[in-house]
Amino acid sequence: MWPYFTKTHASSESRHLPAIALALVIFCTGCMSWSWADESSTAVKILVTYHSLSGNTERMAEAVAAGAKSVSGTQIVLKRVGQVTAEDLFSADAVVVGSPVYWSNMSGEVKAFFDNWQFKFGVFPEFKMKNKIGAAFTTGGQISSGKEMTMLTILAAMLGNQMIVVSGGGAFGASATTEGESPGVDDKELAEAKALGRRVADVAKLIKIGSLR
């Protein structure tokens, strides 16, 4: 009886093999679909915005954008502060703001941009910028012209909106000294700006992945 039982059992198993194979195909296809969906859903949008008269802050902004773009799954919007729309602002997962140093502070154009978050775009009382990533960069003529103070005022405005601020390139962000022995923006300063962009993109992706769990 034992050989007969073994043969019958094996025959029964063989009849179920097509069904098992089909189930495995469906399972694997489902896993692939979830993988594609996860990759799409974790794509992050990063707004890099700035004010620039001489072109120095604009060069830094372009480097920040390039650094962010080097991280996979990112969509970059690069605009001057006066061109940013409510859609640009509220659809972004991260906002990086750059300003030249004016009297040890952000420029009037950048200050007006932050004021417009409420007066033009209406961020309150819902705190529409809450948990978005924020970062700053700046340019100034001299070493002690107020670059750190300018970045801190930008970050303070972001913190007031319950954003998550990050640094990169330097302690408070990326900066460039545009006069003296190295006029304009040099390669080292552009590298710091790119590093800031990459850091913002990396953190924004981590936050977005965590929010989907």
Question: Whereabouts are the PLM-identified features?
Answer:
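N-terminal beta1-alpha1 ligand-phosphate binding loop
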Residues: 44-68
